[in-house]
């Protein structure tokens, strides 16, 4: 492939997990890939150029885009993957904790997207792939605030896609289910635990241990990201992996009460009265 025809991709949160797998898969697909991490010492390997970027800091984002654009003269693909979760009852999570997570999961997406849109518009095209979650369209007991942040990403992405499609830019969602990454190990615990939920915490730990045994590898999600990035006529959303596809179908076609019962059974919650 000639140098001038090589497309440039940026993957935020590329130090590990889905971001790292995506960076490697995009490079294998022919992209010149820049990954971002909050730490300068991270090496994604495989030829991915790692840059320092804090998605909560507009100056850091501007510096990152200036570096990429200065070296390549274009940005064809932005994959917004950086994010983290809070696990626990919604009542136990403080507003400050929730704000910190939304600052990354939602407003980080907003900041990087607003920075890249003028560049994509000037080159008359581009694609933005936002990593959401099945928890962006289903109830997420004991991860309510994380689910809320992904619901917000879904609404933002769908609306933005309509706004910029006429400019040659598409905004696409990729929705993984449980994935074998360090995400579950890095879940932030609520900062104001309540005694009434003490027994639930032990149950949640058991639940996580069980679901992670059958969780998808990050490469499964990365493969779907490449598909979303390269499709000539992309869908607005892509379920990533068999479990995500199953949940998506159930959400669309199963009656609400039956779906609620299925959620409670999956999460090992008491039956509905």
Question: Where would I find each of the regions flagged by the language model?
Answer:
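C-terminal beta-strand-loop-alpha-helix "lid" module of Rossmann-like NAD(P)-dependent dehydrogenases
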Residues: 165-212
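Active-site loop immediately N-terminal to the catalytic Tyr-X3-Lys motif
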Residues: 91, 138-144
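Active-site helix of classical SDR
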Residues: 113, 149
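The beta1-alpha1 cofactor-binding region of Rossmann-like NAD(H)/NADP(H)-dependent oxidoreductases
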Residues: 53-63, 95
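Residue(s) in the substrate-gating loop at a strand-loop-helix junction
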Residues: 133
């Amino acid at each position: 492939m000639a140098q001038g025809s090589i497309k440039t991709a940026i993957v935020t949160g590329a130090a590990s997990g889905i971001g790292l797998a995506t960076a490697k898969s995009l490079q294998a697909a022919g992209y010149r890939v820049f990954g971002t991490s909050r730490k300068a010492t991270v090496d994604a390997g495989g030829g991915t150029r790692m840059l320092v970027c804090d998605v909560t800091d507009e100056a850091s984002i501007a510096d990152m885009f200036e570096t990429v654009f200065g070296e390549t003269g274009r940005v064809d693909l932005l994959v917004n993957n950086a994010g983290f979760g809070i696990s626990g009852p919604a009542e136990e999570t403080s507003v400050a904790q929730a704000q910190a997570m939304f600052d990354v999961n939602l407003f980080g997406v907003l900041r990087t997207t607003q920075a890249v849109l003028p560049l994509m518009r000037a080159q008359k095209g581009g694609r933005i792939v936002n990593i959401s979650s099945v928890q962006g369209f289903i109830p997420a007991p004991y991860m309510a605030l994380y689910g809320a942040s992904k619901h917000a990403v879904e609404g933002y992405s769908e609306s933005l896609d309509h706004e910029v499609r006429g400019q040659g830019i598409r905004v696409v969602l990729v929705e993984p289910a449980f994935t074998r990454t360090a995400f579950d190990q890095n879940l932030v615990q609520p900062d104001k635990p309540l005694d009434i939920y003490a027994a639930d915490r032990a149950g949640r730990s058991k639940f996580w241990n069980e679901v992670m045994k059958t969780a998808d590898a990050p490469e499964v999600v990365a493969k779907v990201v490449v598909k979303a990035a390269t499709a000539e006529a992309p869908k607005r959303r892509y379920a990533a992996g068999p479990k995500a596809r199953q949940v998506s179908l159930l959400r669309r076609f199963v009656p609400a009460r039956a779906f609620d019962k299925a959620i409670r059974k999956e999460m090992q919650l008491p039956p509905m009265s």
